[in-house]
UniProtKB/Swiss-Prot annotation:
GO terms for biological process: translation. Part of the 50S ribosomal subunit. GO terms for cellular component: ribonucleoprotein complex; ribosome. The gene is rplX. InterPro entries: KOW, Rib_uL2_dom2, Ribosomal_uL24, Ribosomal_uL24_CS, Ribosomal_uL24_KOW, Translation_prot_SH3-like_sf. CDD domains: KOW_RPL26. Belongs to the universal ribosomal protein uL24 family. The keyword Cell cycle does not apply. One of two assembly initiator proteins, it binds directly to the 5'-end of the 23S rRNA, where it nucleates assembly of the 50S subunit. One of the proteins that surrounds the polypeptide exit tunnel on the outside of the subunit. One of its GO terms (molecular function) is rRNA binding. This is Large ribosomal subunit protein uL24.
């Protein structure tokens, strides 16, 4: 998967289109990512010892990886490619040619 935890991404589809944020978690088995502040859902929690009343908690839901583009250091969104530099496989932005890793 071309997106990793900590990458700055731009959402390119959906209700949060245009939002730029950081990837909190990558889920490669299901091709989804959790992006900070994107795809917020309300989750009802049962009462427990920490929260005796119960609560409605807002949290980020996973979005499909095809709905985000990785931003390089200059803030330019583009596709991600792979190349070998000094015997090590690195990710790079196909638009700017800048190494991401």
């Amino acid at each position: 998967m071309f997106v990793k935890k900590g990458d700055k991404v731009r959402v390119i589809a959906g209700k949060d289109k245009g939002t730029e944020a950081v990837v909190l978690k990558a889920l490669p088995k299901v091709n989804k990512v959790i992006v900070e502040g994107v795809g917020m859902i309300k989750k009802h929690q049962k009462p427990n010892t920490e929260n005796p009343q119960g609560a409605i908690v807002e949290k980020e839901a996973p979005i499909h990886v095809s709905n985000v583009q990785v931003l390089d250091k200059n803030g330019v969104a583009g596709r991600v490619g792979y190349k070998v530099v000094d015997g090590k496989k690195v990710r790079y932005s196909k638009k700017s040619g800048e190494v991401l890793d």
